[in-house]
Amino acid sequence: MSGNLRSRIVTQGVQRSPNRAMLRAVGFGDGDFERPIVGVANGFSTITPCNLGLGALAERAEAALRAGGAMPQLFGTITISDGISMGTEGMKYSLVSREVIADSIETVCNGQSLDGVLAIGGCDKNMPGAMIAIARLNIPAVFVYGGTIKPGRYQDQDLTVVSAFEAVGQYSAGKIDQTTLVEIERRACPGAGSCGGMYTANTMSSAFEAMGMSLVYSSTMAAEDPEKADSTALSAKVLVEAIQAQILPSAILTRKAFENAIAVIMAIGGSTNAVLHLLAIAHSARVPLALDDFECIRARVPVLCDLKPSGRFVATDLHRAGGIPQVMKMLLVRGLLHGDALTVTGQTVAEVLRDVPTEPRTDQEVIRPWDRPLYSSGHLAILRGNLASEGAVAKITGVKKPQITGPARVFDSEESCMEAILAGAIQPGDVIVIRYEGPKGGPGMREMLSPTSAIIGAGLGDAVGLITDGRFSGGTYGMVVGHVAPEAFVGGTIALVEAGDLITIDAPARKIELLVTTDELERRRAAWRPPAPRYIRGVLAKYARQVNSSSLGAVTDAFI
């Protein structure tokens, strides 16, 4: 097998005797230098329940790689806990961590001349960070998702971490007492695994399964169930076979694969963050992809799955109902999926789905029949207008009326908005504007889960709108529009909004407009001055200087 291995540059020849000496110290024997050397990029951490189980999965992958004839080399990648950093300055590092993860995996794999990589991730940015690196590296690779958390339970209701965020708003509005608040807090996260609804982590793992970079059924498994470890071992076996056959990510991460991922994300009601991350992965894979592609697919694909945050069920329920393969098969038979797209197994999507039923089982309610979808078209709408000439992303599930025109309540940070919500200062009909939270302005494009959850908890979810140049958590729902571009920091129109200005959000018409005359906007633009950078040293300063627009994926390597 050694003939086509790039690790030969490290393991072969007299001049590489010192290199082999060091490899012997980490477990290589005389016969091992002809084997493929495979990295296991492991995001294990006790920082977050999302990554708590990854160490055991890495050990299982290591054993399976050895059994398959490869030499595994484990290395760590960082993680940020979005849930724990939410609503704080620390959340500015979340999207930054996507780039750090990508850079670190690329650095190790190329620095060590590895022949392949098995990446294991849990929390939100682990997934796109790993896939960006895989696309850049273009060496045989497979992604293993650490698995989803099981739901908590209180008063006969399933709980997720978003339940705790919403409880803060309910408590502040006097709708629940402190005892209930504390009980929800205690029960929301009962063990290891990523946040349980169709939030960002589960959305991206589902996307990777649809793209063929993860094994079927693996994206909805519970972190603590034995099948997750078994799937990890099988992923390692498949990776060794991919190395032997030289199945490269560039053959898998094609335009068809991205279109398949977008279709599945629409069908499952996935996170707005998928738009940002798929744009970034496509950039690394050199695949043309734009916001308009999401809108084109959205118009054709219904929402089939009744999943939290706006629905009833969690990812483990989806798994029991047939998982992502069931959703994919429903799309495939209706011509909404590319069946000839390649997967990491060497099979096509159609071949992988051959034995999956064409329709969902009748004994479950998670996946709707095709003729009774939750929504007739996709939920992630791309809005444009004078407030977002480059585009913005709206999630239009879970709202009774997807249009609003109201007076602007303007905040230059998430914290000041949160104070107003908890103080009862937001009124029905208001359109909240949170700005200077974009990729450059934040920097880091924080997720606005705390204010959106507080709005829901206060009973205002159907009565107010919220727009921001920041992001939203996968746990967000309501009349919310994020990723507004150009962002305020670079002089986007959102920077020119004044308190009391009328703003229209019209999701069905895909419009977002500031109802101010062109002359007045030009007067304000002439008077506007860019703010000083919030950071002049460290990683946030570097990120702010290099990151591009959210409409392009907020990538940091778009130098040409």
UniProtKB/Swiss-Prot annotation:
| Reaction catalysed by this enzyme | (2R)-2,3-dihydroxy-3-methylbutanoate = 3-methyl-2-oxobutanoate + H2O; (2R,3R)-2,3-dihydroxy-3-methylpentanoate = (S)-3-methyl-2-oxopentanoate + H2O
Using the UniProt record, name the top-level EC class of this enzyme in a single word. Answer: lyase
What are the names of the required cofactors?
A: [2Fe-2S] cluster; Mg(2+)
User: Pfam families this protein is in?
Assistant: ILV_EDD_C, ILVD_EDD_N
Q: Which domain of life is it from?
A: Bacteria
Q: Which positions are annotated as binding Mg(2+)?
A: D82, D124, K125, E447
An example of a GO molecular function for this protein is: 2 iron, 2 sulfur cluster binding
N6-carboxylysine: modified positions: K125
GO biological process: any one? isoleucine biosynthetic process
Instruction: Give EC number(s), comma-separated.
Output: 4.2.1.9
Q: What is the protein's quaternary organization?
A: Homodimer.
Q: Which PANTHER family does this one have?
A: DIHYDROXY-ACID DEHYDRATASE DAD, DIHYDROXY-ACID DEHYDRATASE, MITOCHONDRIAL
Can you tell me which family this protein belongs to?
Answer: Belongs to the IlvD/Edd family.
Among HAMAP family, the record links this protein to: IlvD (MF_00012)
Q: What does this protein do?
A: Functions in the biosynthesis of branched-chain amino acids. Catalyzes the dehydration of (2R,3R)-2,3-dihydroxy-3-methylpentanoate (2,3-dihydroxy-3-methylvalerate) into 2-oxo-3-methylpentanoate (2-oxo-3-methylvalerate) and of (2R)-2,3-dihydroxy-3-methylbutanoate (2,3-dihydroxyisovalerate) into 2-oxo-3-methylbutanoate (2-oxoisovalerate), the penultimate precursor to L-isoleucine and L-valine, respectively.
What name does the UniProt record give this protein? Dihydroxy-acid dehydratase
Q: Tell me the gene name.
A: ilvD
